[in-house]
Amino acid sequence: MALLCAREKSTDFGQIRNGLRGEPELVVYSSSQAHSSITKAALLAGFGKSQLRSCAVTDEFAVDLADLRRQLDNDVADNRKPCAIVACTGTTATTAMDDIKGLADLAQEYGCWLHVDAAMAGSAMILPEMRHLWDGVERADSIVFNPHKWLGVVFDCSIYYVRDEQHLVRVMSTNPSYLQTSADGEAPNYRDWGIPLGRRFRAMKLWWLLRCEGADKLQNRLRRDIENARWLEQQLAEQADWHLIAPVALQTLCVVHRPAAIAESELDAYTQAWCESINASGEAMLTPAVVGGTSVVRISIGALATERRHVEQLWRTMQKHTA
């Protein structure tokens, strides 16, 4: 939805009238660490892969603003039109946090729609001490995050915020005679805010969680997960052969075990092997990933029932399977 709105805003809603013909070539920008759903959404919105730009990242795996500006300038020089910038807070592999303020400045300068993909990490916006990670988010055109990923809502539940709902209405509105009623106009008609004509009552799940647990309990659970991640980070730091590949922004750690007996050329296969060994044992579930060209193991601490004793057991399990 965000990219459909971005497409129409960039063309003064011209593609609604004329389809994909007769308009400048539009371009979408995101970091190389952006979720695969960004590419899928762009393709569904009518962009071709040649219209997608994957920007370099910093040493902390956030988008490199200088490289983004370079790509924006190159496209403008080639008579292409910058359409949308996607900010990731945080990225799937490492939970890296893009600089929203910097991206908002570029979006304003180049006339782009700014979409913030807060997916899992967006739940941490309920913590006052973590809100600095989203500085500038009030300047976004749209934001999405998934309460089913960390907040604890039953799957599936995604929240989509848009600055101006009229962009949704302009893109999605339909009003055939068989849908018209005497009450039209008295309240928002959500068939005009999205692709489906009808929708399930997903909001009930979120409402029920908020009523049952309340803000304080939800905040304390997220703080517990972050504290447990910090504890494990400290254990890893005290061992010479364990390494963190990325900063620990919230509750996700990307680790590599580098024993002296394993050659560098064999390290990726070794990493995948001990990750698969733990998963096969049923003692824990970890996720392999590739970060900066290196195979890593992702440890995401965020299940509802996960306590310190479980993380302590995980650490013992990791040591056992790499002994």
Please identify what each model-predicted range represents.
Residues 3-169:
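Conserved PLP-enzyme active-site core in the AAT-like
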Residues 33-35, 59-60, 90-92, 121, ...:
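Short, glycine-/Ser/Thr-/acidic-enriched flexible segments
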Residues 244-278:
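Conserved PLP-binding catalytic core of the aspartate aminotransferase-like
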Residues 104, 108, 237, 278-279:
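Anion (oxyanion) recognition and catalysis
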Residues 110, 288-323:
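PLP-dependent enzyme catalytic core of the Aspartate aminotransferase-like
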Residues 91, 110, 135-240:
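Active-site C-terminal subdomain of aminotransferase-like
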